[in-house]
């Protein structure tokens, strides 16, 4: 009788250790995923808060609009990831070009001109990659 209770207790302890190890591995990977998601979210919020673009000049004709944007923040942005809206309508990518053409990134304290071949707008909205919206009214 004494031998079977020792074996039973040993089996129970081993089963508890295996379950504990499995639970630890599962919870550790879960918390690692949560931590990674929080880090990504924090970096996105940090970039969004430190992005400050200013529409400094708009020159518009019937078929072309030149929009000069100045980066007054501390975050490097990519102008080709901007979404441009004229009077609430999204301007297609093929109608947008940039001057200077080789400038892929807009660094702080620098400006870029976006050339839009589209109808003349009365309201312009530029949505950055971080989700910030910048408005300009021609009226």
Swiss-Prot record:
Primary localization class, coarse: other
Highest taxon, organism lineage: Archaea
Lipidation (S-archaeol cysteine): 19
GO biological process per UniProt: archaeal or bacterial-type flagellum-dependent cell motility
InterPro entries (UniProt xref): Flagellin_arc
Signal peptide residue numbers: 1-18
Residues where N-acetylcysteine is found: 19
MF GO annotations: structural molecule activity
Membrane recorded as keyword: yes
Topology class, membrane: Lipid-anchor
Keyword set includes Protein biosynthesis: no
GO cellular component entries: archaeal-type flagellum; membrane
Entry's localization field: Archaeal flagellum; Membrane
Family of the protein in this entry: To M.voltae FlaF.
Protein name, per record: Putative flagella-related protein F
Protein species of origin: Methanocaldococcus jannaschii (strain ATCC 43067 / DSM 2661 / JAL-1 / JCM 10045 / NBRC 100440)
């Amino acid at each position: 009788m004494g031998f079977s209770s020792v074996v039973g207790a040993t089996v129970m302890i081993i089963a508890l250790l295996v379950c504990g190890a499995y639970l630890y591995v599962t919870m550790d990977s879960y918390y690692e995923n949560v931590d990674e998601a929080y880090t990504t979210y924090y970096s996105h919020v940090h970039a969004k808060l430190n992005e400050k673009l200013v529409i400094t000049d708009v020159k518009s004709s019937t078929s072309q609009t030149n929009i000069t944007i100045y980066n007054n923040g501390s975050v490097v942005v990519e102008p080709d990831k901007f979404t441009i809206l004229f009077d609430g309508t999204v301007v297609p990518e093929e109608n947008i070009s940039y001057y200077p053409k080789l400038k892929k990134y807009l660094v702080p304290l620098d400006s870029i001109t976006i050339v839009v071949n589209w109808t003349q707008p009365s309201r312009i909205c530029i949505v950055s990659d971080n989700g910030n919206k910048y408005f300009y009214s021609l009226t």
